Every structure is written in C-alpha cells, then in structure tokens.
A protein has these predicted regions:
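N-terminal hydrophobic/helix-forming segments and targeting peptides
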Residues: 1-348
Length: 348
C-alpha cells in the first residue's frame, strides 16, 4: 500500500493555477515564480539557473547515488512574426504548435510595456460567405492571422498599440474541471507533471519523511525546443526520473486514468535497470503503472543524455489525451503519478 497522503484537491488546484499562468517556451518567468513560491512555502530552498529554470536541492539520508526529478513548465506558444499591412498579425510557432488546433481560439498579445491586447486566431479571408475555399483551405502560419480586438486597419495603427515583432502570444487555455474528475485544457503537457511533483513533495514533507538519496528537482523551461533537461543538474547524478505526459492513441496502453512508464521513444530506449526498479516499486505499492513505447516523442531525459549526461534515466507521467491540442487527463492519473513520485523519493 502507498505510504503517503496525496491531496488531490491541492494537486488539481495547483494544476488549474499553473494552466491559467501563461508560459510559452522563452517566456516562463511567472510560472517559474509560482512553482518557486510553492516549494519555498514547503521549506525547500530554490535557485534560478542562468537560463531561468528552477532548481531545488533536498538533502537525503545518503548521497551515494544522487537523484534528480525533472518536469517542464514551458508550453506551446507563438510570437508575432509580422505586422501585416491590414493591421493583423502573422505568427511564428516557438515549438510544436499545431495550427489547426488554435483556429478561432482567443488569445492575448503581450507587449513590451506589459499590456495584454486581446484577439483571436482566424483564417485569413475566412468568411464562408466570401471565400468558397474557407472550409478546405490549409491551416498554417501563412494562412492564419491574429484578428485584434482593437480598431486597427493598418500596420502603423497596430504599432501604436504597442505591438511589435517578437511579442509573445498567449492562447487561452480554457481550463475546465468536471464533476467526474476530468481536467480539460490546453497545456496540460507538462504542467500536469509539475503539479504532480509539487503534490508529491508536499505529501513527503507533511509525513516528515526524508528522501533516500540527495535529490535535485529541476523545473525546466526549454523542454519543448529540446534543451531543458541539462540545465545545471549536478554532475554526479546516478539517476534521473523525467516527469512528462504519457501518450494516448492507437497501439498504446496508456489512458487518462493511469500513470505510464515510457520504455522507449524516438530517441531510443530509457534505462532498463531504473525503469525495472520503478515498475517493481509501483507493484509493491499497488499503483497500476502502464508500460508503453511512444513513436514520436522526446523528453528532457533525451536532452540530458545528448548533452553528455551519465546518469540512468526513466520517464513516467499521467495519460494525456490529444497531446498538443485541447488536452484532457483525469485526477486518478494525476494522483497515481504523484503517489509514485513520493514513493520513489523515499525508496531505498
């Protein structure tokens, strides 16, 4: 049986708060500050890296095989690439954004002055009564534009609002928590795992438990572009557990109600010894952990290894439906993931 009391209420509320805090790759300071405040409130000292990620070091009963856990707070997003002659905006994705999924979505343009200007993402010349190809036209960065909720019809008028090339664009997350326990939102990847990590650490602290090994927590902020997982982690790490969303789809075992362990992704297999240990730990604690292989996937663990990291690496996370779209998970998967993290922290 599990040894820790995981507060599902805290976990879900923390996730909701994170989801409502914009953090596209490259513009994550507010979300990092939120996580920093949560950890500091638990009595855990934190530091920022030069790149803006968050590090926390927790003393363990031993330091013979130091550990790290990492989850990323950066999400999909976009930046202003061009102010068009008609005053509307052409965007560029900062990572793996799928353009059809953000059509008609509300958004905010964050200006250098701190103002947030509302608008929406639409197909250029998208009126069905005018353009007979509106329903079949491709949706991509060249065919879609931001329609600002301001009176502007020229590029000069848009610039007078304070908007300029390079401004970040925050798509509305549209967070909903259902009575049946589902959480539906954009950007559950990977804020769900950040919330799970916080809930696990909270459960461990409240139980007055100590990690089995000296442990580093890394909240990375450049995972979605491939260089988050190597940021300032100790050189003497023996193992790293990456916390990232589990895939759901045809041919996979994962679902929205369970935690999964990825044994191989696009970068190759993860460490068998560490993965086997985590699977055994889940079995002993009654956690139904689903093994899986992800066909189109990479993680901060892959980035850590590519940068020369020597530690063993494993990857776990809650099942998330429709990744990089309007995502959904369930509190059962979140609770199981947090429980497994807490168990791993203290496991001998």
């Amino acid at each position: 049986m599990a040894r820790f009391e995981i507060s599902t209420e805290y976990l879900v509320q923390t996730l909701v708060d994170l989801l409502n805090t914009p953090s596209p790759t490259g513009d994550t300071d507010y979300a990092i500050s939120f996580v920093q405040g949560e950890l500091e409130g638990m009595g855990i000292h934190t530091d920022r890296t030069v790149k803006g990620a968050l590090l926390a070091h927790i003393d363990g009963l031993r330091s013979t095989k130091p550990r790290a856990l990492t989850a990323h707070v950066d999400t999909l997003g976009a930046m202003v690439k061009e102010i068009k002659p008609n005053g509307r905006l052409k965007l560029v994705a900062v990572n793996g954004l799928m353009w059809p999924t953000v059509e008609s979505e509300g958004l905010s343009v964050a200006t250098q002055s701190g103002r947030q200007i509302r608008g929406s993402m639409v197909l250029a010349n998208g009126a069905a009564h005018v353009n007979k190809e509106a329903s079949t036209a491709p949706r991509n960065a060249d065919t879609m534009e931001v329609r600002l909720d301001e009176r502007t019809e020229r590029a000069e008028e848009t610039r007078l609002l304070g908007i300029e090339v390079g401004d970040y664009v925050y798509f509305d997350p549209r967070v909903e928590v259902s009575g049946a326990g589902f959480i539906r939102s954009r950007f559950i990847d990977d804020k769900a795992c950040v919330a799970c990590l916080l809930a696990a650490v909270k459960g461990m602290v409240e139980a007055q438990a100590t990690p089995a090994q000296r442990t580093t927590l890394l909240i990375s902020n450049f995972e979605e572009v491939g260089h988050g997982g190597m940021d300032s982690v100790p050189a003497d790490l023996y193992e790293m557990v990456v916390l990232d969303m589990a895939c759901i789809g045809e041919g996979l075992r994962g679902d929205e109600f369970h935690c999964s362990i990825c044994l191989k992704d696009s970068s190759g297999p993860y460490s068998k010894d560490l993965s086997d240990r985590i699977r055994g730990l889940a079995d002993r604690r009654g956690i139904d952990l689903h093994p899986d292989i992800y066909p189109y996937y990479g993680s901060d663990g892959s980035a850590y290894w590519r940068s020369g990291g020597q530690a063993q690496v494993a990857l776990i996370g809650p099942g998330v439906d429709t990744s990089h779209g309007y995502e959904r998970t369930h509190k059962d998967a979140l609770t199981d993931t947090a429980q497994l993290i807490a168990e791993y922290l203290v496991d001998e």
